[in-house]
A protein has these predicted regions:
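Terminal, non-catalytic domain-edge segments
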Residues: 331-357
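Glycine-rich anion-binding loop/nest that anchors nucleotide
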Residues: 269-271
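Active-site mouth of glycoside hydrolases
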Residues: 1-258, 262-266, 276-329, 335-336, ...
Length: 357
């Protein structure tokens, strides 16, 4: 489209979505609960983890050692992709983590006796990551019979969750890595989208406001300009980033949508959260989602939708950001979802033209 947004069948596609970090290792009941609730709320896209490195979680591991992959471990992820397709949901699958949860870059550093930022520089570590990416994207789902790279339920591959390289505040190291890996992913999955998965930090020297500063070696405008990166991602956590007021988030949303439009690419607020009582949080989420709508943003994912355990109790609120269905927050987000994408139906496996472009 002329403004650089998502499109399906020639029509613009905007969405409201969510995150969930346990679809790839929890049981079917728990995964189905999350995905069904997402569909009931009217969400279109779910962002989930597609990695589990080193130590198992609940007995499941995907990459127990470098270049070693556990086929049995992929069963929950296969099921989640299959079930998402049945429900007409699209998935954003993240390929590694900046943080130690489920292994991620810290696990690669341990494996290779390296420092965190060596992940973005050393060829041996890059080769390990590339091998992992090739294995995941090319694998055949036991439930659908399709390779992941051909599955319309998978909308996007993300290089990493919140990658940071603070040892190079210029941003050159992270940009070079993202350029190499986004091109590689695009070769493996040419009909699916590619995003970096970063937080949207601006990388400005001498900027006193942390998310706009160069502290973590992330330069968002350079990342979204990369030719194989299809859209820009940004996160929003004012409490964690410097105890800023909720109103600060309106500026953050505006700036990213504006700057993505300048390079004719979509911008997605793919994580946002605020810890507070439900009424206070609802007011803040209403202001932020209204801003996405008002500034003509392309999509957003709140952090995070959880479902029910095997015994039908609610999943624990480990980080204080849990959203459950039904709730007043879910009702608020359902209204936002309806305004973002009021007329796009569900897209099951094999739907023609179902990949956003």
């Amino acid at each position: 489209m002329s403004r650089g947004g998502f499109a399906i069948g020639g029509r613009r596609f905007r969405f409201a979505g969510t995150n969930n970090y346990y679809l790839h290792y929890k049981n079917h009941h728990m995964a189905d609960s999350v995905l069904t609730d997402a569909s009931l709320i009217g969400l279109r896209v779910v962002r989930c983890w597609g990695f589990l490195d080193g130590a198992p979680a609940d007995g499941t591991v995907l990459q127990p050692a470098p270049f070693s992959y556990d086929e049995d471990g992929f069963e929950p992820l296969d099921h989640a992709v299959f079930r998402a397709g049945q429900l007409g949901l699209r998935l954003v699958i993240v390929l590694t983590n900046n943080w130690p949860d489920f292994g991620g870059i810290p696990q690669y550093a341990t494996w290779f006796s390296a420092e965190h930022d060596d992940f973005f520089r050393r060829r041996d570590i890059k080769n390990c990551y590339r091998s992992w990416v090739r294995h995941v994207i090319g694998r055949r789902n036991r439930y659908t019979g399709m390779r992941y790279c051909s599955d319309p339920a998978i909308m996007t591959w993300e290089l990493a969750n919140e990658p940071r390289c603070p040892s190079d505040t210029s941003g050159d190291t992270l940009v070079a890595w993202a350029d190499e890996m986004s091109r590689y992913v695009k070769e493996l999955a040419p009909r699916q989208l590619v995003a970096v998965g970063d937080e949207g930090f601006y990388g400005r020297a001498h900027e006193p406001c942390y998310p706009y500063s160069d502290h973590d070696g992330v330069v968002w405008q350079r990342l979204i300009a990369l030719p194989a990166v299809d859209y820009g991602t940004f996160h929003l956590y004012p409490q964690q980033w410097g105890d800023m007021l909720p109103e600060w988030g309106i500026r953050w949303i505006h700036d990213h949508i504006r700057d993505a439009r300048a390079v004719r690419k979509p911008a997605v607020l793919e994580e946002f959260g605020w810890r507070a009582d439900e009424a206070t949080r609802d007011a803040i989420y209403r202001a932020w989602t209204d801003a996405v709508e008002r500034f003509d943003g392309d999509g957003d994912h709140f952090w995070l939708l959880t479902g029910r355990n095997a015994d039908d109790t609610q999943y624990s609120d480990y980080d204080g950001l849990r959203v459950i269905y039904p709730s007043t927050t879910a009702t608020l987000l359902a209204g936002h979802a309806g305004r973002m994408c009021p007329s796009v139906g569900h897209f099951g496996h094999g739907s023609a033209g179902s990949h956003p472009r």
